[in-house]
Design a protein with these regions (language model features):
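N-terminal, active-site-proximal structural segment of metallo-dependent hydrolase catalytic domains
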Residues: 1-49, 226-227
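Active-site-proximal beta-strand elements of phosphoester/diester hydrolases
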Residues: 2-12, 80-82, 99, 107-117
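Active-site metal-binding loops of divalent metal-dependent hydrolases
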Residues: 10, 37, 114-116, 145-147, ...
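Active-site environment of divalent metal-dependent phosphoester hydrolases
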Residues: 12-15, 39-42, 63, 119-122, ...
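Structured beta-strand-rich core segments of catalytic domains in phosphoester-bond hydrolases
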Residues: 31, 35-108, 202-205
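Active-site neighborhood of phospho(di)ester-bond hydrolases with catalytic His/Asp-centered motifs
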Residues: 32-36, 57, 142-146, 165-168
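Metal-dependent phosphoester-hydrolase catalytic domains
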Residues: 89, 135-139, 149-227
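His/acidic metal-ligating clusters that form di-metal
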Residues: 100-104, 108-110, 124-147, 155-156
Length: 227
């Protein structure tokens, strides 16, 4: 089963939900892993523009919630999801992960949308907490989001010891895969990690004018095949 995955920090849709959707629409993602998803209304507008369905705490009446989201395009559907807030996360900007099970025609995939913080020690602790959370998940696992650090930093290294880094295994060899800042990308801080049941067929960063204007992060798109 083929699956196209989008990873994007949309910065609260400050450029507008429709603008963010226009940046990725032609690539028709089956699954989107969104960070800084913003308000309920803006996320709903983004979903409508892309004809996708959400699993997101932003659609629940919770104050100061984790602002990540997992979106799917029919015939994929959200089977269930829950939100895990990382321990010792800041009260006014909580970090965490949305853990969703998505399904289609007998396939089940675990999709984890994560946003790590700005402090290195905190990121490492939360990366360990993330992998503990994923222990025992059956079937394909996709972990995507904004990790706020480079590939050689401790939290990302922790994950690459346990999952495949999709860019390292399928990224454009003529590109560094940098996603931040969008107006002059020099850092690869947005990632998709996949479990061994998933084959990476290709990965690329969208860097045209529309993508650059949609957020301070560029979108990452990855094609995978599920065993």
């Amino acid at each position: 089963m083929d699956l196209r995955v989008l990873v994007h920090n949309v910065k609260g849709f400050k450029a507008g939900p429709e603008q963010a959707a226009a940046a990725v629409a032609e690539h028709v993602p089956d699954l989107a892993m969104i960070t800084e998803a913003g308000t309920r209304r803006r996320l709903e507008r983004y979903c409508r523009a892309l004809e996708m369905e959400p699993a997101a705490p932003s659609l629940l009446p919770l104050a100061r919630s984790v602002r990540n989201a997992v979106l799917v395009r029919p015939p994929w559907r959200v089977v269930r999801f829950h939100v895990h807030r990382f321990h010792a996360s800041r009260r006014f900007y909580p970090r965490g992960v949305v853990v969703a099970v998505i399904g289609r025609a007998g396939y089940r995939v675990h999709a984890l949308a994560v946003h790590l913080g700005l402090a290195g020690e905190e990121r490492r602790r939360h990366a360990e907490e993330l992998t503990d959370l994923a222990v025992g998940l059956q079937g394909p696992v996709l972990v995507g989001g904004d990790f706020n650090e480079s590939a050689r930093s401790p939290a990302v290294q922790w994950l690459t010891e346990r999952y495949w880094d999709s860019w390292a295994h399928g990224g454009d060899r003529d590109s560094a895969g940098s996603t931040f800042p969008s107006n002059d990308p020099t850092s690869r801080i947005d990632y998709l990690f996949v479990s061994e049941q998933v084959r990476v067929d290709g990965a690329w960063v969208l860097a045209d004018e529309t993508a650059r204007a949609s957020s301070d992060h560029l979108p990452l798109v990855v094609d995978v095949t599920l065993d």
